């Protein structure tokens, strides 16, 4: 299932995954609604708004009344649904801010997740990590329940680090599937029935480089395989 409030990204999602249900507002989404619709959850992924965290914004933080304060809704869903894994993304300044109390925003993220029984790994992975032509710094936060931590010995063997070292040394952006088929324009897209220049640029600004969450997904699968082999 998807949860997306903006119309243009919803159209893009519907184009690529027409049979996947979409919900509009994370503030209204609940475990009961998902259960009613027959949806079970193993993984939650999300990028909560960055406008109040980014160095380009006013850095109002993640408190109540801010757009970035939708983090609280992400946390609520993790606590209610108890997924095996939760993966969140935001701008790198989440690690550093606010200016008057460096690190306080991220300390809250860690405290919130620990408070509902989740351990956390995090990595600052820019797009250039996989060879893209721009930096696009982002922090990726992988949370997993304490039960998984005990089963996999995660505290001694982080899920992500080994996979990241492997990928960075063996694979470049040009080698990813479909890389040779990119359109000539890397901003405005093509006349594909969906693209609208203004909305597309805004959506690209809010989007992620998909190869990075794919890499993280493979790292999770590797950890699961290792645990099964050791069992």
Each language-model region and where it sits:
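Short intrinsically disordered terminal tails
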Residues: 226-231
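Glycine-rich, N-terminal phosphate-binding loop of Rossmann-like dinucleotide-binding domains
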Residues: 48
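Basic, amphipathic alpha-helical recognition segments used for DNA target recognition
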Residues: 45
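Class I S-adenosyl-L-methionine
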Residues: 2, 29-42, 51-204
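Active-site catalytic microenvironments for nucleophilic, acid-base chemistry
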Residues: 219-223
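Acidic-aromatic/histidine active-site loop/patch
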Residues: 213
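SAM cofactor-binding core of SAM-dependent methyltransferases
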Residues: 1-29
